[in-house]
Structures are given as C-alpha cells and as structure tokens.
Amino acid sequence: MKPQFRNTVERMYRDTFFYNFNNRPILSRRNTVWLCYEVKTRGPSMPTWDAKIFRGQVYSKAKYHPEMRFLHWFRKWRQLHRDQEYEVTWYVSWSPCTGCANSVATFLAEDPKVTLTIFVARLYYFWKPDYQEALRVLCQKRGSPHATMKIMNYNEFQHCWNKFVRGRREPFEPWENLPKHYTLLHATLGELLRHLMDPGTFTSNFYNKPWVSGQHETYLCYKVERLHNGTWVPLNQHRGFLRNQAPDIHGFPKGRHAELCFLDLIPFWKLDGQQYRVTCFTSWSPCFSCAQEMAKFISNNEHVSLCIFAARIYDDQGRCQEGLRTLHRDGAKIAMMNYSEFEYCWDTFVDRQGRPFQPWDGLDEHSQDLSGRLRAILQNQGN
C-alpha cells in the first residue's frame, strides 16, 4: 500500500526533528526518512529557489523513498529549466539506501549542470558491503559527476532547525553527545568513502623538525590488522585518519584530542575476540592524559596490541614523559616515524595523485635525534 504522505511539507514539528535527526549512530524504530532540501541557482548571489521537505518509509518500495520522490519532482521541473545550473543541498535523517544511491548517481551523470551536497544525520546500514559500495559510487570524485556527502554537525542541525522546524521560539539546543556522535560518524564515513588527506596538510603537520611552533592540531592515521594463521591480515575497512576536535562552545567546550576521538571509534568496530593489531601514525606523541587513556584501553583489551609511530614528541618534559612510560610499560610499542613510515602514510592516506613521497631536508637526522630522545624517556624509569 502506498504510504499516506503528502509529497512535500514546508516545516516539521520540533519533536519530530529531535526524534528523527538525533545523530546517535545506532538507533531503532526510526523508519521514516526525512529529507530537507534547498535548491539554489548557481551564481555569485546564489538565491534559494526552493526549500521544502520530502519524507518516506525506509521499508516501503524504493519509489516512495524521499530521495526518489525528490528526483521524480526535480526531473519533471528540469524539463522547463534545462539551461540553468543549480546547486542542490539535502539534509537527511538517514544516508541513502543502495537503490537510491545508485539512482542519484545515475541522475547526476545524466545532468552535469546539477551539483548535489548531502548532509546526513546517520549512516544507514554502513556495515554492509553493498551499501558501502553504493555510497562510494555516488561520491566518487574522478571520472564522472558525483555527490559530496558529509555528516551533519552542529551548524547543519542549527540550520535545519531555523529553516525547516515550525513554531520555534527558542534557539537550537543540541542533545547529549551530539559532538561525540558526529566524530564517530565522520570517521566512519571517511573509512567508507576512503577519504584521503591533502598533500599540504600531511607535509605541514607531519614535518618532523623536533621543535616547531604554531602546530596546534594533531593528525592520527590508523590501520587495523587481524592475526590469521600466523600472518597479520590488513582490515582495509578500518583504515583512515582523523584529527583533534578544536574547542567549540557548541561541541567539545575544551576540545578533544585525536587519540581520545580514536578511542571513541574503536568500540564502534565491534572487534571480536581474535587477535588484532592497531597501528597509529601521529603528528605528535600523546599527551599525559591521552597516554593514560590508551594504556587503560590496552590493559582492558588484551586481544588488541597497539603500535604508535609519532612524527614529533609532544612536550617531552614532566608528566608527558610519565604518560609515555606508562603506555610503554602497559604493552604499547612506541617509536618515532622514520622514512619508511612517512612514505607508507603518504602512499596510504594522502591524495598524492601518483606522486611519490619526497622527503624534506633533515628528515632522517630529525628522526634519529627524536628516536634517541624517546629511548631516553622510556628508559628513565626512575623519573
């Protein structure tokens, strides 16, 4: 039976928004997909031409899904406006299913004058290979038109609140753990779409001169392997990179370090009781607090071994030294990155477009110097 929904609505109720757009990664009973859209003419001023809401049931026939309803409406309308270029933005409670993702990819290939940005509150069946592949096809960057997909953060939720929620008399108040859930989903989408780092970002952040100023971000690249018949087998579905979350009054008021964001992510993988090896490549070694939390993790998860390769040592005085020693004592392997680790990260995590890794002046000397300092820190058990 056809779902009893009007084609579009202009506003949703406050409780409807909070219930359906909650970004907790795993939620049950959210069977209605809400798609808020904006269509703008492409140009300097980019006025909004239309902004409404489609909705549909996830378990209904594909033609009743909101993505398909939007395409049906937009295709008919485009017949009268073939020459104009448009930028379309979606804010959806769930990412598209495989059928809708494939249909949207086909539409974009047929109409290159339309660009599409999709902000999603949650990822639908993100652990299933066919869903992962459909989203990769939809968002592939080379060879054909593609969509840009991002996870909704505070700004997008606030925008939807202001634009698509009726009767609002108060500002948007984020629910508990919104920023933490955003971080998890952002990293998961990066794994799924196989996001790569900009070459300049890698070079500037992983430059291993022992003393640098102005580097307040930490980047953490990671890979996971499982032991099988005595051989470590890469799990490429759990490979990616993330960075620390800057202080934000609407997100993490005190910020959140990259290592803690990474520890938030690991339980999301649902690793079983087999033996795993997790390897991190970080632009800075962990601070005292992060080292303590990582030590707790490996103590509580004896089937997971942890290897950390750092480009630089973060504040190698006082408590940071103590934190590194604790982490090392509890079983983590800690070392400084050398040429082979930098090259591996360049080849694996950077959008290098075929360019080989070019070491900067002093890379080997800096690595040797830092390795000596790290050995002294880890061996100085008396401090």
Swiss-Prot record:
It comes from Papio anubis. InterPro entries: APOBEC/CMP_deaminase_Zn-bd, APOBEC_Cyt_Deaminase, CMP_dCMP_dom, Cytidine_deaminase-like. Belongs to the cytidine and deoxycytidylate deaminase family. Pfam families: NAD2 (PF18782). This is DNA dC->dU-editing enzyme APOBEC-3G. It catalyses: a 2'-deoxycytidine in single-stranded DNA + H2O + H(+) = a 2'-deoxyuridine in single-stranded DNA + NH4(+). Residues 29-138, 214-327 form the CMP/dCMP-type deaminase domain. Zn(2+) 2 binds at H257, C287, C290. Zn(2+) 1 binds at H65, C97, C100. The gene is APOBEC3G. The modification Phosphothreonine is found at T32, T218. Keywords: Antiviral defense, Cytoplasm, Hydrolase, Immunity, Innate immunity, Metal-binding, Nucleus, Phosphoprotein, Repeat, Zinc. The record marks N244 as: Interaction with DNA. It comes from the Eukaryota. GO terms for cellular component: cytoplasm; nucleus; P-body; ribonucleoprotein complex. One of its GO terms (biological process) is negative regulation of single stranded viral RNA replication via double stranded DNA intermediate. GO terms for molecular function: cytidine deaminase activity; RNA binding; zinc ion binding.
